[in-house]
Amino acid sequence: MGVPVVDLPKMSILGLSYTSPFTAIRFVLFGTTRRGGSSWTDLTLIEMVAAYYRIGAEEEVRPEVGLGQSAKETGYWTFEGDVRASQWNFAGIGATGGGRPGISWPSLEEGVRGHLRRLRMYASASAPYDLDILRRSLPLSYWGASPDVEDLGGRWAKSPTYGISVRQYVNTLISS
């Protein structure tokens, strides 16, 4: 899927987007169609993309990184694992398998903000944080430990290749 990661420099989690919202919408709608449809309507998916771009700019997190990770974690928003669509948990935060659904947020906006703010914490220890939106503590040793997408492996998830897998989703989004 996408461009081989080994041939590319690392991808920063923080910064300006390399893509437009229209490119991201193509990625989201194509991905969900290929998977047999999403748990949400196309309108909700478009609203989700808009929220990632708006909140990503506020949080200084690249929206395509958040959307790529969300596509991986939710199975292109089919929510066939432990996390349900009604939780607005876009990255499986707190879901550790065995039926444990993880964190829930009250709205799409808060779910996107919680996801992107958590990514920001992994990428930078110096940024100010509203810890209430995070709803789950993050060990201090992880704050700023993953400035690049590839560095998420073994931290966000146990797999050492997790970050490389997320990068492949982001590459697919960028090339959509």
Give the role of each language-model region.
Residues 1-176:
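Catalytic cores of secreted/periplasmic lytic hydrolases that degrade extracellular macromolecules
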